[in-house]
Amino acid sequence: MTLQVCIMTPDRIFWNDQADEIILPTNTGQMGVLTNHAPLITALDIGVTLIRSNSNWNPVALMGGFALVKQNQVTILVNEAESAQTIGVDEAEIAFQEAKTKLEQSQGEKQRVEATFVFKRARARYQVVKQLGV
């Protein structure tokens, strides 16, 4: 038995396929989902989700949202999703380093919140390309 995983963004269905396992970046840490998981709804943080299908792990950068797990179906609603194939390695690394520097230099609450958002997004994209070894 497998999971049916569907990742939806506001403008398209990003992923709709079966998987053996999925690891979600929730607001309280990573959460793994296997078949026959208890039903739940969880908020998703900006981060990397890992989808295992046929012994292959597929990393996907998710930009925050929600996940519903019910009856071996995982429905993920996110603001944006990106795979390693659509992210330039050099671009992701430069954006990550710039975001890290900006976060370290941020002053004041508003600037820190904005810099943290940009950093999390850049880190997720960078982790996706690094995990796939592109």
UniProtKB/Swiss-Prot annotation:
Domain of life: Eukaryota
GO molecular function (one): ATP binding
This protein's record includes keyword Plastid: yes
Cellular compartments annotated: Plastid, Chloroplast thylakoid membrane
Keywords: ATP synthesis, CF(1), Chloroplast, Hydrogen ion transport, Ion transport, Membrane, Plastid, Thylakoid, Transport
Primary residence: plastid
Pfam families: ATP-synt_DE, ATP-synt_DE_N
Gene3D superfamilies in the cross-refs: 6.10.140.480, F0F1 ATP synthase delta/epsilon subunit, N-terminal
SUPFAM superfamilies on file: Epsilon subunit of F1F0-ATP synthase N-terminal domain
Function: Produces ATP from ADP in the presence of a proton gradient across the membrane.
PANTHER family given in the database record: ATP SYNTHASE DELTA/EPSILON CHAIN, ATP SYNTHASE EPSILON CHAIN, CHLOROPLASTIC
The name this protein goes by in its record: ATP synthase epsilon chain, chloroplastic
Phylogenetic placement of the source organism: Eukaryota, Viridiplantae, Chlorophyta, core chlorophytes, Trebouxiophyceae
